[in-house]
């Protein structure tokens, strides 16, 4: 009897997860054992296989690397932590957090609590500033770690999340002189400036917390369900604010996605409108009568791929905007279906037309449109929101897609690999809201 009681206590100390998540693969005819094996295979591709992007450092740290760019980014580090907590991989989670805290997180100064968005794999910073989606994922992953493992196993996860939440509140700072050579980021700012993760007027997430980047946003940074997690379990006294941020993000996504294609721009204004091409002093000006060059960030491209999956996440975890989200899911799948389930490319203008050559964002030294598995993954994940029969074709396409180099040698183990893993987690019912253990 005592043994059974101890087992019951141990079971209670493990996490209970949200019960709503469906196993769409099984619903569409795949066998549960097949799905479990495939999910394990895709996880191992990212963390343990020959093309892995996760690397351990010593006895206690590790990092996720964007291999093709030879760096570690807050994007990948925080994604890795979110994946680790979902899979119950505490050692991986703790290693990634220790590396992030040691090398990326500012421990003092104007940016205290924020994370340098890019570091060399030895920890040397490539940049000091933050990219706001990293903080978004770090906070949420830490809260889930607290909910899953408690705060007495070596890291006080909730305290770490609360520290970041306190540091991202609006504040004034005086910018340090900036090195020359970065005209695309605007002129040097003078005098007191504002820093914040969430724009205090619109309640929308910034592209970057400071500098020119806090004047606009990135639609792929909008994950309303994460704010709901903060409201429930951050215990930082700001629950009403986070609920408001969730609602404002949902309203923003209505504006930022095309009413016919469902596509969105990589970056846009807080009202969902297009970015205007900045013309800083010293940059070439258009000649008289010359049509201004289109700002390529107004196109659907790499960052944008994440939006279908982010909206899917909110649909699954919250359901607060389910009717619109179902319509969105079918709109965007209808568009890609019209392009060919096995043929659609990875960059478009929001109206569905193809970008001109100079608008195509290069990756890995190639300026080329591709049928990328990262986008295949996120469009397939949107099937969770959809009722039409087309969804099965997208799910089957993801299941059968091979993550391997293109004929010209291009291969993205990092971004494509992580989005592929997230999609398999979603469609197998294994990307869930983690509630506190009892």
Positions of PLM-derived features:
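Short glycine/serine- and small hydrophobic-enriched flexible loop segments
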Residues: 81-88, 137-148, 225-232, 309-316, ...
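Internal amphipathic alpha-helical repeat/solenoid segments
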Residues: 38-76, 84-127
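Solenoid-repeat scaffolds in large eukaryotic assemblies
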Residues: 80, 92-93, 154, 161, ...
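Terminal, non-catalytic domain-edge segments
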Residues: 20-29, 310, 382-438
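Extended ligand-binding clefts on enzyme/binding-domain cores
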Residues: 20-41, 48, 67-74, 109-114, ...
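Sec/Tat signal peptide C-region and signal peptidase I cleavage site
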Residues: 15-19
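Aromatic-rich carbohydrate-recognition surfaces in CAZymes
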Residues: 70-77, 124-149
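Sec-dependent N-terminal signal peptides
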Residues: 4-13
């Amino acid at each position: 009897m005592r043994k059974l009681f101890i087992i019951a206590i141990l079971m209670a100390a493990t996490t209970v997860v949200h019960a709503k998540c469906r196993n769409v693969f099984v619903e569409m005819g795949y066998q549960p054992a097949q799905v479990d094996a495939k999910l394990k295979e895709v996880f191992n591709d990212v963390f343990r296989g020959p093309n892995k992007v996760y690397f351990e450092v010593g006895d206690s740290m590790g990092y996720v690397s964007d291999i093709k760019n030879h760096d570690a980014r807050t994007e990948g580090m925080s994604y890795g932590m979110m994946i680790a907590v979902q899979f119950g991989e505490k050692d991986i989670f703790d290693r990634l957090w220790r590396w992030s805290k040691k090398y990326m997180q500012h421990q003092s100064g104007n940016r205290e609590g924020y994370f340098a968005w890019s570091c060399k794999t030895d920890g040397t910073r490539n940049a000091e500033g933050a990219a706001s989606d990293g903080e978004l994922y770090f906070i949420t992953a830490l809260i889930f770690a607290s909910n899953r493992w408690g705060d007495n196993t070596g890291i006080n996860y909730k305290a770490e999340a609360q520290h970041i939440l306190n540091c991202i509140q609006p504040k004034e700072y005086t910018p340090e002189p900036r090195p020359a050579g970065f005209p695309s980021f605007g002129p040097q700012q003078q005098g007191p400036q504002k820093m914040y993760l969430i724009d205090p007027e619109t309640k929308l997430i910034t592209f970057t917390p400071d500098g020119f980047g806090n004047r606009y946003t990135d639609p792929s940074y909008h994950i309303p369900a994460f704010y709901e997690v903060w409201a429930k379990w951050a215990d930082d006294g700001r629950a009403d604010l986070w609920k408001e941020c969730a609602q404002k993000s949902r309203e923003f996504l209505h504006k930022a996605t095309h009413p016919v294609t469902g596509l969105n721009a990589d970056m846009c204004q807080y009202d969902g409108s297009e970015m205007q091409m900045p013309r800083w002093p010293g940059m070439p000006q258009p000649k008289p009568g010359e049509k201004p060059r289109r700002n390529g960030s107004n196109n659907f491209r790499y960052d944008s791929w994440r939006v279908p999956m982010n909206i899917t996440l909110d649909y699954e975890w919250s359901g607060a905007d389910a009717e619109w989200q179902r319509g969105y899911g079918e709109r965007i799948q209808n568009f890609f279906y019209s392009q060919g389930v096995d043929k659609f490319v990875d960059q478009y203008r929001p109206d569905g037309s193809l970008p001109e050559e100079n608008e195509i964002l290069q990756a890995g030294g190639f300026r080329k449109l591709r049928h990328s598995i990262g986008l295949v993954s996120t469009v397939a994940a949107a099937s969770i929101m959809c009722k039409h029969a087309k969804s099965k074709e997208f799910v089957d396409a993801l299941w059968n897609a091979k993550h391997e180099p293109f004929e010209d040698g291009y291969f993205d183990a990092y971004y494509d690999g992580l989005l592929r893993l997230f999609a398999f987690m979603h469609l197998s019912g294994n990307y869930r809201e983690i509630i506190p253990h009892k």
